Each structure stands twice: as structure tokens, then as C-alpha cells.
Amino acid sequence: MTKIDLLVKNAHVFNVYLRKFEDVNITIKDGKFYWINKELPGIEAAKVIDLQGKYVIPGFVDAHMHIDSSMTTPKVMGQTIGKYGTTTIIADDHEITNVAGVKGLKDFIDEKAPIDIFFGIPSSVPSTNPNMETTGGLIGVKETEELLKDPRFVCLGEVMNFKDMTSDHDTLIKKIIAACRKARPTMPLEGHVPAYHSEDLAKVIYAGITTDHTQQTSSLVDEKIRSGMFVEIQLKSMHQEVIDTVIEHGYFEHVALVTDDSMPDTLLKGHLNLLVKKAIDMGMRPEDAIYISTYTPARHMGLWDRGAIAPGRVADFIVLNNLEDLSIAQVYKNGLPFAAKDEKDNNVYPEELLHSVKAPKLSEADFDLKTDLVQNGKVVANIIQINEVGTFTNHIQKCLEVKDGHVQWKKAGLALMLCQERYGKNEGRYAFALIDRGIVGDGAIGATWAHDHHNLIILGTNIAGMVSVQNLLVEEQGGYIAAKGSQIVANAPLPLGGVVSLEPMSVLGKQISKVRETMVDLGYKNTNEIMSFSTLSLLVSPTLKISDKGIFEVKTQRHIPLFEC
């Protein structure tokens, strides 16, 4: 007689190896699946659960996400997404690393969480180079080799610097890739490969990159898979043509659903389960949608012990009421019911992480946009134009009036953006940009959660409001703030590194939701307003972006002047 801890009977159980449901019984012993079969002779169970025909699938595995990009901690993230069935994540926490380096990263990830968390080694800190952006942390070969010794790190986090990756020179990122290949020859090397195709794509794969998660089209998915890449499909890539391409070509072995950046207010509704449900709604068989959110991501990351309901695998599973709406009845972690909590993070973090915003406060005079190209007349402005979908921008030009050296940007229907160095390295130096299709109403938004350098960014049409937002960001040591007119109406403090909240998700989600509502009221138009604004500073996301060192064209990394004659 074999004694086991739990017997789960009368269930439709998903077999990932056959990609179909079977009417079998499940046994669990010491937190792992033991024997799965119709008949289980000689088994003595301490506890028996009769599911009465419900469906059982493996716990979801999210192979590409960022805990700190959800502005939260590992503990709160685990509390939040565990109840949605996500039991394993691979997190590339390069936000906190850009702020505080390897030490800050270790302080951040050492906290215990109620789900299993593996990590990617942040490869792009900074995302470009110190000549283009100022960061608090730097990751080089030495730091990479240090993290390679830690078994929690199972992949190289997304490599972003296309120019250095494909350069003829022996660049830093090439050295980092070589260090990974030497220490862990089969470790996945995650990429950030937006819109690259043909020879550019070949160059990236030739450099060693195995995976891409960025915004996809059907043709890009097809080309990447045919070229040997594993493609991670996030929400913004879930267009009908992309899903149809995966289905029609049977690309299920080569793709996974991932969340990448989940906003706190979105996490109040769900996590990876929402993408699985969406894939089903778009015509994918439930069995295939489940497969690419459990088994393929686990296999891709070398996590053989999960992503399947089979002997020896970690007993993480989800009980579903039905397959039509993916309604979750119960989640189990290590064979035990997942206990959903919504608690504040009371972990004690180092003081340097709690006091990372060292920028001086600004006044209205600091926001006076001037040019020395002409005293009275016109200048040509290089303008960042926001798109309503995605994080890519357009580079446009407009002629603007100049009076007594002051640029009359408001008359052109533009918004003013400022990016200020906040690590105490350059005395709070700042650069300006002009934004088209940003805020059109009277107000301002600002954040220290500014991908990926996380300097202080402000966008607005009301100078007094911009000053109010900037001053409060400094006082509160970071956050996401919005003002109408000169009055602050929404505030999400992010005191940990200026990028992470310590509040439970129920509180943080509502705070970010209020910021988002204010942005919409001010006329900001994008399918993800928060991410759109916070990636206006992301120097690896096309086309034109800003840092504390100015405006840059992403692909060429060329500095672009704000004004030309």
C-alpha cells in the first residue's frame, strides 16, 4: 500500500504530451504529482477530492514578465497572480536593476513569494549606453558572471541594444552573451527584437538571441519561427492575423503566451488567464491555448519539473469549472489550495532603495522653453508623435513661432516633456521634448517609472501643474502622478527605488486606475496610456525617444536636436 497526501478524482485532466483531456485520477505526494491513471490500485490517500467532472490543467507558466514593471514586489505579485492560476514566473527585473544595480536586484528578489519565481539576468542596464542615458545601476560581464552562479537565474533577460549586438566590434553585450554561453551553453537568451526582419533579424539570431517577445505581426511571427526563434506572444501582439498564423501553421511548439508588462489596475482583473481566454475567443482550441501557457514556456526555460500533470512534476494545477470561459474554481500550489491574500509588503528594504530620487526640485522658470537659433521668427522642431496603439512613436517636424527667444509650443497644440536625471550623478540635468497627440487638456502627468532608465519624466500643458507634479515626485521619492490644471488629482507613490509600491495590489491598482482616468480626461489616447507615456523614454523602442541626455533616433542611436533652423 502506497500512502499519498491527496487523491483528486472524477476530473477531466489535461495531458500536455497528448494535448488532450483524459478522464483519469491524480495522486499527489510531498508536493509533487505521483501517479496519474484511471485505476490506482494499492493507493491510500490522506485526503480525497471529488471534482465531479471539473477540468484540471497545469498551473500557468509566464516565461517573460517583469515584477517591477507592475510596480510591485515579489510577495505582492505572487499574492495577486497566484489566484488567477499563474504558479510560476520568469521575471526579468531590470527596472529595479537600472535604479540600484546588482545589490538592489538581490535585495528585491530575496523576498519570499507564494508562487515560484525564477529570474532572467538583466542584460541591458542601461538599455543602450551611458552616453545616451543615465542610470543608477550598471550590469557588465563581472555582474553577469556573479548572477550566473545563482540557480534562480535561468535565462539572460531581454537584450535590447541592436546596434551593439550586431556591431563588428567586441561590445559589452557581446561579452555578456559570451559569458552566458560559456557558463550555461543551453540557457535561453531573451531578445527585444521589434520590427526587425530580413538580414537585421538574421544578425540578431546569429548573435545568439533565441527568443523575442515584442510587438508582432503575422509575417514577423512566421519569419522568426522559420529562422529558429521561440516567439512569446503578449497581449499587444494578439491580433487576429497573428493568432490565425499560429493556428494555420501549427506553430504551438514554438510559441508561448506571456504578459510582459502588466499594469496594476489590469492585475485587479486577471493575469495570464486573460490571454489564454482571449486566445480561445479568437479561435484557438482550448487545448492549444493551455499548452502554450503551461508546457511550452516551461520547456523553453528548461524547467522540466513543471508545466505538466505527470509523475515527479511540481503539483501546481488549476481546477476549472468549464473551458468556455476558463472560470477558475480553485488553484493548487505544491498540492495545497492557494491561499489568496491582499497584504501590504512589510519587508525591510535598505535605505538606499527607499531614498533613490536625488533630483532637485524645479520651478516654473525651469520649464521655459528657449532657443538660441533665432530671437524672433520660426524654428523647425523635431517632435515625438504618439500612436494610439503600441509604444512605437513617429518622428515628425513642425515650424514653431519664436518670440524673444521663447518657443511658442502651446500655439501648435503640442505638449511639453521634460526628462530629468534623478540619481544625483549630473546635478539633476534635464532635457526637453515636444509631444504630439499627448496631453491636449489643461494639466500634467509625471513619473519616475520611466522605462528603462527610470529618470524623472513630466508631460504637460500647464507649467504650474508640471512643477507641482515634479516637486511631489521628489518629496515622495518616486511615483506616478497626474494633475488637472495646477492641482494634483491622482497619486500612486512608488517609494522603493522610485519604481515599486509597497501597497497591496487592491490599493496600488486603484491608484494607477485613477492616474489612467486622469490621463484619458486630459486627452491622452493609447490602448495602454500608462505604458505609452512611460516608454516615451525607452531608447530601444522605435522611433524617437527621450532621456536626460536629449532626444534620440532609436535604431541609429543618433542624437536629434530639438530645434533646427
From Swiss-Prot:
Any keyword Transcription?
no
Cofactor(s) annotated in UniProt: Mn(2+)
**Single GO term (MF):** adenine deaminase activity
Mind listing the GO biological process terms from this record?
A: adenine catabolic process
Q: Does the keyword rRNA-binding apply?
A: no
Give the protein family: Belongs to the metallo-dependent hydrolases superfamily. Adenine deaminase family.
The name on file for this protein is Adenine deaminase
- Source organism per UniProt: Lactobacillus delbrueckii subsp. bulgaricus (strain ATCC 11842 / DSM 20081 / BCRC 10696 / JCM 1002 / NBRC 13953 / NCIMB 11778 / NCTC 12712 / WDCM 00102 / Lb 14)
